[in-house]
Amino acid sequence: MTLFSSISSMSTSMSGSKSSIASFGSGTSMSSNSIACGGGCGGSGGILGSGLGLGLGLGLDLTGGSRSRGSCGGNRGNGNGNGGMGGGNGSCCGGPCCGI
């Protein structure tokens, strides 16, 4: 949690594409929830972050049922807040995993 929080806070000072990569990288070392969250949260305001969040959400829905978390993360990264294609009520949407 400490590592992920530091990456998330650091990503805000980086460019959109770099922050999404950094956050995604830290997310892969944790649970599937963190992976889905990392995609959208890392993009903070960037189109790339939104794409990663949506893509991860769709992919994880086939194996871990995390589509709502991934979609929410992508929309948050794109500046649209909660409420993605999966409902936007996953534990990562407004939880501590994104440092929000």
UniProtKB/Swiss-Prot annotation:
Pfam families, alphabetized: Coiled
Region named Disordered: 1-29, 67-100
GO process annotations (BP): sorocarp development
Any coiled-coil regions, as ranges: none
Source organism, top-level taxon: Eukaryota
Gly residues composition bias: residue spans: 71-93
Family classification: Belongs to the hssA/B family.
Stored PANTHER family: HSSA/B-LIKE PROTEIN 1-RELATED-RELATED (PTHR31059), HSSA_B-LIKE PROTEIN 1-RELATED (PTHR31059:SF5)
Protein name per its UniProtKB record: HssA/B-like protein 37
Species of origin: Dictyostelium discoideum
Lineage: Eukaryota, Amoebozoa, Evosea, Eumycetozoa, Dictyostelia
